[in-house]
Amino acid sequence: MAVPARRTSKAKKNKRRTHYKVTAPSVNFDETTGDYSRSHRVSLKGYYKGRKIAKAASAE
């Protein structure tokens, strides 16, 4: 099994990890329901692309 010849410094490690960033989720306005929902997902009221495709989840 391969073993690193030298220890990776904190600076080298952090430079490598600069690309691991958290991005904000994309949110779209649904004109049918008047709510905001994430792209390519069913809204909380059961609409997708303006059509009703699922029953709305009830708060029990």
From Swiss-Prot:
GO terms for molecular function: structural constituent of ribosome. Signal peptide: none annotated. Keywords: Ribonucleoprotein, Ribosomal protein. It comes from the Bacteria. It holds the Pfam family Ribosomal_L32p. GO terms for cellular component: large ribosomal subunit. GO terms for biological process: translation. InterPro entries: Ribosomal_bL32 (IPR002677), Ribosomal_bL32_bact (IPR044957), Ribosomal_zn-bd (IPR011332). Belongs to the bacterial ribosomal protein bL32 family. NCBIfam families: rpmF_bact. This is Large ribosomal subunit protein bL32. It comes from Streptococcus pneumoniae serotype 2 (strain D39 / NCTC 7466).
